Amino acid sequence: MLRIADKTFDSHLFTGTGKFASSQLMVEAIRASGSQLVTLAMKRVDLRQHNDAILEPLIAAGVTLLPNTSGAKTAEEAIFAAHLAREALGTNWLKLEIHPDARWLLPDPIETLKAAETLVQQGFVVLPYCGADPVLCKRLEEVGCAAVMPLGAPIGSNQGLETRAMLEIIIQQATVPVVVDAGIGVPSHAAQALEMGADAVLVNTAIAVADDPVNMAKAFRLAVEAGLLAPQSGPGSRSYFAHATSPLTGFLEASV
């Protein structure tokens, strides 16, 4: 069970809604993933009506929506988008994204911290997408963010946990949930993140662009379950030397 702010989730896999070939395929994949929290870019939906091609099936699926501010380049733009989302969707939950460079989509740490502090004061439950910077993540936690979402690698790159060393520090020092976001390309990456101690992962591109998004979503669901179960089971310690799993000489001595 994962608790963030006032909500609890059985699934530790969060999913996105971008890049799917159709809304129907998107919903089928989300259901197959078991995800209960789904991000939604405000720039991609018509907030004036709930029969939007993306929004309507998500509402029907009964998932918790996490609107994001993707496309915002400044704190001011992100705050504006946040208020639009709250008014249209009736939720205080927000994934805060501010990335001024469209080529790399790396989060702006200064603008993110600035926006996060303001939005928390305005009553939002803020989950900021940020770089894998332990100092920044601690600052975001201190201003009241409900979780932190450090990147594993650039958005959509499928590179995996390129920031592993920094993620380990973030996880070790955090007192709020850590959700590894961006760069997760295959299910094993998700399992590794959970084995490291992350509380959840957010996956979009790896599922949406797969040849079979529904089966890939299932694979991620199973990987996340494995990643959670493994550390709970007390894995053996690593050793420099080999250790036999069965006696090496007993059968020889018995035959003499």
From Swiss-Prot:
Homotetramer. Forms heterodimers with either ThiH or ThiS. Belongs to the ThiG family. SUPFAM superfamilies: ThiG-like. The gene is thiG. Pathway: Cofactor biosynthesis; thiamine diphosphate biosynthesis. GO terms for cellular component: cytoplasm. One of its GO terms (molecular function) is thiazole synthase activity. 1-deoxy-D-xylulose 5-phosphate binds at G156, A182, G183, N204, T205. Disulfide bonds: none annotated. Its EC number is 2.8.1.10. The active site is at K95 (schiff-base intermediate with dxp). Pfam families: ThiG. PANTHER family: THIAZOLE SYNTHASE (PTHR34266:SF2). InterPro entries: Aldolase_TIM, Thiazole_synthase_ThiG, ThiG. It catalyses: [ThiS sulfur-carrier protein]-C-terminal-Gly-aminoethanethioate + 2-iminoacetate + 1-deoxy-D-xylulose 5-phosphate = [ThiS sulfur-carrier protein]-C-terminal Gly-Gly + 2-[(2R,5Z)-2-carboxy-4-methylthiazol-5(2H)-ylidene]ethyl phosphate + 2 H2O + H(+). Keywords: Cytoplasm, Schiff base, Thiamine biosynthesis, Transferase. The keyword Lipid biosynthesis does not apply. This is Thiazole synthase. Catalyzes the rearrangement of 1-deoxy-D-xylulose 5-phosphate (DXP) to produce the thiazole phosphate moiety of thiamine. Sulfur is provided by the thiocarboxylate moiety of the carrier protein ThiS. In vitro, sulfur can be provided by H(2)S. The keyword Cytoplasm applies. It is found in: Cytoplasm. It comes from Escherichia coli O157:H7. GO terms for biological process: thiamine diphosphate biosynthetic process. It is an enzyme of class 2 (transferase).
